[in-house]
């Protein structure tokens, strides 16, 4: 089995999501380390979960965290990429290839050249609320774009095909340890899976 599109699953904070996504051959799994988030994962929990994952690239998601906080965490964990929100100050201080998350298109319009000016440091861009007007500001050679399925998946899939984009999904909390309702993630991953 494989998936029709490249898939990034964000905000994973439990073993159930991580193992399920790994078994479905998603490409990236992101873990929430944002210092401002109530749902951030502990380093110990992350390390325990990471030991069970094989295949996907591992992303540490820092959102709007300070550079001091990011550097402290990056010295304690091993990941393939780190993700930050659209922020020109932080990216200048990061020496690792990173992922940029655009959570609000209005922020992007305030600094439309951000991706272009930092394209040598950016591996991919994730967009929470994509519309067609954004494509010219984010599409550069060597940078993959992943968009979140906020409305109907049918509408999202049209954009995936039209612009050759990847799909961004989000993990959720377990109902209790080891017990998980996968609803949205499993429905979409099953929809885009191709049996081999």
PLM segments and residue spans:
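Leucine-rich repeat
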Residues: 96-97
């Amino acid at each position: 089995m494989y998936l029709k599109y490249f898939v990034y699953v964000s905000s994973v904070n439990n073993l159930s999501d991580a193992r399920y996504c790994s078994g479905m051959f998603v490409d990236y799994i992101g873990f929430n380390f944002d210092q401002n988030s109530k749902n951030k994962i502990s380093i110990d929990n992350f390390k325990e979960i990471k030991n069970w994952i094989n295949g996907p690239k591992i992303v540490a998601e820092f959102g709007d965290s300070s550079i001091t906080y990011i550097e402290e965490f990056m010295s304690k964990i091993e990941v393939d990429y780190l993700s930050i929100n659209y922020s020109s100050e932080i990216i200048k201080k990061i020496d690792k290839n990173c992922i940029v998350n655009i959570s609000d298109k209005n922020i992007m319009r305030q600094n439309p050249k951000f991706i272009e000016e930092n394209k040598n440091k950016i591996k991919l861009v994730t967009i929470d609320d994509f519309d067609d007007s954004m494509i010219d500001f984010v599409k550069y050679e060597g940078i993959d774009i992943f968009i979140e399925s906020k409305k109907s998946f049918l509408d999202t899939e049209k954009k995936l095909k039209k612009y050759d984009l990847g799909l961004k999904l989000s993990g959720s909390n377990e109902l209790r340890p080891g017990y998980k309702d996968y609803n949205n993630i499993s429905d979409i991953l099953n929809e885009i899976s191709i049996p081999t």
